[in-house]
């Protein structure tokens, strides 16, 4: 269509030129009379000239007299060492002016021995076919055919694509370009552009229209640089130097130009939608690709909708009857032999259905046998119904059903046995893993070393517990309400833990020997407890009375059933008897006075089993017990006024941040971590007045600090990935 417009513009230009030669309008004649045309028609002529310039696309050169036609000749049997320039010189010498020469190249840039030559005039094309046909070039006779519609070149190009997949534009021309699916399936990109891009024959310049008049080439380059490397950007201007609202952008690669069309066509720039397309000079002059021909429809049919196949293509109904091994299921007969043939293929089997079922054991670990049973049952029911209905091929399914009998027997025999063996092998592995857990738990027998630590509790800190217990009274009152809330939650959680804890029961039995070794150590602890009863404990224990009442109700919610499921009864009464608890209950507890009350008794009864099982859980590292930190830990925690023991790790509220940007200040650090919770303190580590790239942040609770580690660790600040950890040295 654009070519037709240009042709019309040329005709209009010719008419204007003829009018100018005949006489300028409005110029008075020799007798002073006005000419045949008045001065009022001059603006109309100027408008025509402007329209002519716009339609011609800025006076671009068009080498063809009639742009709608191409006068091509297709030459084959060209020596492989002949370059396109040499071929052009030969054709120019023998025929005349040549517009375009293209050698077809393979993927390696070597000549395929054929070429396309375009001429400006039709006579030149016919002369080339007469003169150059059978002309000897380097000992090889050339074969020249007229090819105005490009059919011969199209076939040759298809043959090249089928063999090598490459095509060049000339000497050293590029091969076929691999196009990503995002471009191939993009509805905004025409098919002819995609074909030209694949062949490497597409330019890298795009044409942009409907630009705002204040957009200059710098702004245009800035915008289109998002699509690729911009080599040049131009804004077309009028004779006064003002923008015409159109421009061109040249990229480094053709695929970047196609990407620019996809990214910016229809997008707003200063509230005006841009119209982006390939520039006419970037498109190949000859179309050597098969056009996208629409599907031929019957006469009178306007169109069709989407089919049921992939991409809306119609599907062949014949393929629907070819199910995977399900035979031909229809009113005439079920075709059970088809089921057998299909299932045989599932395992690479051969033979009828019965022989194939032997190998069903291969699928023991991966197939849902219940689902297979359901499918077979439904198939048998359908077969019985069809057999009862009779008629047609109904009887043809009976032999297939009979053949299924021994096959199903084999499925229940050898196949299921193999499944059992496979499951048994898996359970054996689980058993071996549990045995390994037992060995680990056996190593906990080193609890005997706890005895020496407990023995140190007496002289180190137990005598000083009186003043500490007084201070504990108020704290325990605050803990009471929390324990009540914990009761309901722990009870619900322990119910879920019942099944896994049952499995650990056998392992806990192995802990019995380790607990038995604790007996003599706890006997020594009984003697130390007798020293704990100075009069100063009375006031503190009186305050603990109501607190223990609350703890009792919380422990009641935990439920005895949940504790029984924990497998603690397997530890044995003998082990607990040897712990020397009778010495702790006789004299020591009586001297602790009525302040403990019956609530403490009930609480201790319910806490006994739980504390017995969990007492050693805090000492995960055997190396701490070897160093005697057990006794020192309790001495520090009971004897000191709220001090933390060196052997027991406490949760810190401070985090340490590494790899911070060097321009980061403490205020910026605080503002950033305020997203995680309330920050009490933030600081940047400095050296000689310069940041060391690390800092600390302190929160109001350990939970907030841990949340900050989870949220901020690995986050990028100014391009640097920070490392956030709990500050253990705080």
Swiss-Prot record:
* Region (27 X 6 AA repeats of [GEVSTPAN]-[ILMV]-[DE]-[RH]-[MLVI]-[GAV]) residue spans: 400-608
The record's listing under CDD domains reads: RRM1_hnRNPM, RRM2_hnRNPM, RRM3_hnRNPM
Transmembrane region positions? Answer: none
Could you list this entry's UniProt keywords, alphabetically sorted: Acetylation, Isopeptide bond, Methylation, mRNA processing, mRNA splicing, Nucleus, Phosphoprotein, Repeat, Ribonucleoprotein, RNA-binding, Spliceosome, Ubl conjugation
Alphabetical list of SMART domains matching this protein: RRM
Phosphoserine is found on 29, 86, 204, 365, 377, 397, 432, 452, 468, 481, 528, 575, 588, 618, 633, 637, 701
Q: Name one GO cellular component term.
A: collagen-containing extracellular matrix
| Residue(s) of cross-link: Glycyl lysine isopeptide (Lys-Gly) (interchain with G-Cter in SUMO1) | 698
Which cellular compartments is it found in? Nucleus, Nucleolus
- Glycyl lysine isopeptide (Lys-Gly) (interchain with G-Cter in SUMO2), cross-linked positions: 17, 37, 69, 83, 88, 127, 134, 143, 145, 221, 277, 285, 345, 381, 388, 651, 667, 685, 692, 698, 716
Question: What GO molecular functions are on record for this protein?
Answer: mRNA binding; protein domain specific binding; RNA binding
State whether keyword Phosphoprotein applies: yes
Residues modified as Omega-N-methylarginine are: 496
Question: Any idea where the RRM domain is?
Answer: 71-149, 204-281, 653-729
Question: Which PANTHER family does the entry link to?
Answer: RNA RECOGNITION MOTIF RRM DOMAIN CONTAINING PROTEIN
What protein am I looking at?
Heterogeneous nuclear ribonucleoprotein M
Q: Which organism is it from?
A: Homo sapiens (Human)
């Amino acid at each position: 269509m654009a070519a037709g417009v240009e042709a019309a513009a040329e005709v209009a230009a010719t008419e204007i030129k003829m009018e100018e030669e005949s006489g300028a309008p409005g110029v008075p004649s020799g007798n002073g009379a006005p000419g045949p045309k008045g001065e009022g028609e001059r603006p109309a002529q100027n408008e025509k000239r402007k329209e002519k310039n716009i339609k011609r696309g800025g006076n671009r050169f068009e080498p063809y007299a009639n742009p709608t036609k191409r006068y091509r000749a297709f030459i084959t049997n060209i020596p492989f060492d002949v370059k396109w320039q040499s071929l052009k010189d030969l054709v120019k010498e023998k025929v005349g002016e040549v517009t375009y020469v293209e050698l077809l190249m393979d993927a390696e840039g070597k000549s395929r021995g054929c070429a396309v030559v375009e001429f400006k005039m039709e006579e030149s094309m016919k002369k080339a076919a007469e003169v150059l046909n059978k002309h000897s070039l380097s000992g090889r006779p050339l074969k020249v055919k007229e090819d105005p519609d490009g059919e011969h070149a199209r076939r040759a190009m298809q043959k090249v694509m089928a063999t090598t997949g490459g095509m060049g534009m000339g000497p050293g021309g590029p091969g076929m370009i691999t196009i990503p699916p995002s471009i191939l399936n993009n509805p905004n990109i025409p098919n002819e552009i995609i074909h030209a891009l694949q062949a490497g024959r597409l330019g890298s310049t795009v044409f942009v229209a409907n630009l705002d008049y204040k957009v200059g080439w710098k702004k245009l380059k800035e915008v289109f640089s998002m699509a690729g490397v911009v080599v040049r950007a131009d804004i077309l201007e009028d004779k006064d130097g003002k923008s015409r609202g159109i421009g061109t952008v040249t990229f480094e690669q053709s695929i970047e130009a196609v990407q620019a069309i996809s990214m910016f066509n229809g997008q707003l720039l200063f509230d005006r939608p841009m119209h982006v397309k390939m520039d006419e000079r970037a498109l190949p002059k000859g179309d050597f690709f098969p056009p996208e021909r629409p599907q031929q429809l019957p006469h009178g049919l306007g169109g069709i909708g989407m089919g049921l196949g992939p991409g809306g293509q119609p599907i062949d109904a014949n393929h629907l009857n070819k199910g995977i091994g399900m035979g031909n299921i229809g009113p005439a007969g079920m075709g059970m032999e088809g089921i057998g043939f299909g299932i045989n293929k599932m395992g690479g089997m051969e033979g009828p259905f019965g022989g194939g079922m032997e190998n069903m054991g291969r699928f023991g670990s991966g197939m849902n046998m219940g689902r297979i049973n359901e499918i077979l049952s439904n198939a048998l029911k359908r077969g019985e119904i069809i057999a009862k209905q009779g008629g047609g091929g109904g009887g043809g399914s009976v032999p297939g059903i009979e053949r299924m009998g021994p096959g199903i027997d084999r499925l229940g025999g050898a196949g299921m046995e193999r499944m059992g063996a496979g499951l048994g092998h898996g359970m054996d592995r689980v058993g071996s893993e549990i045995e390994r857990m037992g060995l680990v738990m056996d190593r906990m027998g080193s609890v005997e070393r706890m005895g020496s630590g407990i023995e140190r509790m007496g002289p180190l800190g137990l005598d000083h517990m009186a003043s500490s217990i007084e201070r504990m009274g108020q704290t325990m009152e605050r803990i009471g309400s929390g324990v009540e809330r914990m009761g309901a939650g722990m009870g619900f959680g322990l119910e879920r833990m019942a099944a896994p804890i049952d499995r650990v029961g056998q392992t806990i039995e192995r802990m019995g020997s380790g607990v038995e070794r604790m007996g003599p150590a706890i006997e020594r602890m009984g003697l130390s407890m007798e020293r704990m009863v100075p009069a100063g404990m009375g006031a503190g224990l009186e305050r603990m009375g109501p607190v223990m009442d609350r703890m009792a109700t919380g422990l009641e919610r935990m439920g005895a059933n949940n504790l029984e499921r924990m497998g603690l009864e397997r530890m044995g009464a003998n082990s607990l008897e040897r712990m020397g608890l009778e010495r702790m209950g006789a004299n020591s507890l009586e001297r602790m006075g009525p302040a403990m009350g019956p609530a403490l008794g009930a609480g201790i009864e319910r806490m006994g089993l739980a504390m017995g099982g969990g007492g050693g859980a805090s000492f995960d590292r055997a190396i701490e017990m070897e160093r005697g930190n057990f006794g020192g830990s309790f001495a520090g925690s009971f004897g000191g006024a709220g001090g933390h023991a060196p052997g027991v790790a406490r949760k810190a509220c401070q985090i340490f941040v590494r790899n911070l940007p060097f321009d980061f200040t403490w205020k910026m650090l605080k503002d950033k971590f305020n997203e995680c919770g309330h920050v009490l303190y933030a600081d940047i580590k400095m050296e000689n007045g310069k940041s060391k790239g690390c800092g600390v942040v302190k929160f109001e609770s350990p939970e907030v600090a841990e949340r900050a580690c989870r949220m901020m660790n690995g986050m990028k600040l100014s391009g640097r990935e920070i490392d956030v950890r709990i500050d253990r040295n705080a």
